[in-house]
Regions:
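Glycine-rich phosphate-binding loops of nucleotide-dependent enzymes
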Residues: 12, 35, 54, 67, ...
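Nucleotide-state-sensitive switch-loop elements of NTP-binding domains
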Residues: 1-49, 58, 71-73
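Hydrophobic heptad-repeat coiled-coil signature
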Residues: 182-184
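Short glycine/serine/threonine-rich phosphate/pyrophosphate-binding segments
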Residues: 57-62, 84-87
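Inter-motif core of Ras-like GTPase G domains
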Residues: 62-82
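Signal for well-folded cores of large energy- and translation-related assemblies
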Residues: 36-43, 59, 66-70, 96, ...
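C-terminal lobe/tail of nucleotide-utilizing enzymes
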Residues: 92-180
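Conserved beta-strand segments of the P-loop GTPase G domain that flank and frequently precede/overlap
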Residues: 13-14, 76-79, 105-106
Length: 184
């Protein structure tokens, strides 16, 4: 399988292989098979870093990946609600038990910025991931706001930092509270 070059990255996804109208009803063995196929059958070529976007939770997908590949680290992404932070906490605990360094926690949908008046509204709460990171003694890596421009650029297939580098949305990624990662 050949990865698709996208903005200087090599990408592959189950979504690229299955019709968008087809339901993905997979049990653990099918998920594990897909992960194994992506790791062994995709012609990645030389890589500095392999980023794997995983579904939330602590199930078969995460365990399969940890068994197949020596991971340099994991970044946990969570929204600020208490219920989401429970999953984030479980994820941190799972990676630590499996001896995978947790590189940090990111808060997604940290706040909504009204495109008309610029007022920030904390729809899902705010700061929960930062507090959780502190409690778990892992680095807090930053916040991603809920902005229409980020969604629109994603739908267009162009990163917001490329399509509108000076925008508030782009600056959330480039000038925000982000902490650069150093891999172990």
């Amino acid at each position: 399988l050949q990865p698709v070059p996208v903005w200087g990255l090599k990408a592959v996804s189950i979504g690229m292989l299955v019709d968008e109208k087809q339901a993905m009803i997979w049990r653990g063995p099918m998920v594990m098979g897909a992960i194994n196929q992506f790791l062994t059958d995709v012609d990645w070529g030389p890589l500095d870093v392999l980023v794997v976007d995983m579904p939330p939770g602590t199930g078969d997908a995460q365990l399969s990946l940890m068994q197949k590949v020596p991971l340099a680290g994991a970044v946990i992404v969570s929204t600020p609600q208490d219920i989401a932070l429970i999953d984030a906490r479980r994820g941190v605990t799972m990676f630590e038990k499996m001896k995978v360094p947790v590189l940090g926690l990111i808060e997604n949908m940290s706040y909504f910025c009204c495109p008309n008046c610029g007022h920030n509204t904390e729809l899902f709460g705010h700061g929960g991931a930062r507090k959780e990171a502190e409690a778990l003694h892992v680095p807090f890596l930053g916040e991603v706001p809920l902005l229409a421009a980020i969604r629109a650029s994603g739908d267009d297939g162009t990163p917001i930092v490329a399509s509108a580098p000076e925008s508030e949305a782009a600056q959330a990624f480039t000038h925000g509270s982000y902490t650069p990662l150093t891999l172990p």
